[in-house]
From Swiss-Prot:
CDD domains: fer2. Ferredoxin are iron-sulfur proteins that transfer electrons in a wide variety of metabolic reactions. It comes from Rickettsia typhi (strain ATCC VR-144 / Wilmington). Binds 1 [2Fe-2S] cluster. The gene is fdxB. It holds the Pfam family Fer2. The keyword GTP-binding does not apply. It comes from the Bacteria. This is 2Fe-2S ferredoxin. The lineage of its organism: Bacteria, Pseudomonadati, Pseudomonadota, Alphaproteobacteria, Rickettsiales. [2Fe-2S] cluster binds at C42, C48, C51, C88. One of its GO terms (molecular function) is electron transfer activity. Its cofactor is [2Fe-2S] cluster.
Length: 117
């Protein structure tokens, strides 16, 4: 049986949804499997910034540093913060048990020329 950890998604800065998620999946995959509004227009291929999320510093510091390709995509993200990452690049490990993931209030999808709210 796959080991699971707790992941809490913070939606619109007020609503929280905590789910149990298997280790080895990405934040983007977990959001989609729980019907949360995290776009992921490129389906996790690191070609957009629509799965941009913000983390608490404690969990941000537990992740490997973002690759140059991820940093380039993050530059396009709406509402970028010092603890922003792409959900497709955050793979769950035991060390991330209890992680809180803040979903942005909007995304910028350059394929559609504008913002999604």
């Amino acid at each position: 049986m796959l080991r699971k950890i707790k992941v809490t998604f913070i939606i619109n800065d007020e609503e929280e949804k905590t789910v149990e998620a298997p280790i080895g999946l990405s934040i983007l995959e977990i959001a989609h499997s729980n019907n949360l509004d995290l776009e992921g227009a490129c389906e996790g291929s690191l070609a957009c910034a629509t799965c941009h999320v913000m983390l608490e510093e404690e969990f941000y510091n537990k992740l490997k540093k973002p690759t140059e390709a991820e940093e380039d995509m993050l530059d396009l993200a709406f509402g970028l913060t010092d603890t922003s990452r792409l959900g497709c690049q955050i793979i769950l490990t035991e060390e991330l048990d209890g992680i809180k993931v803040r979903l942005p209030s909007a995304t910028r999808n350059i394929n559609y020329n504008g913002f999604k709210k």
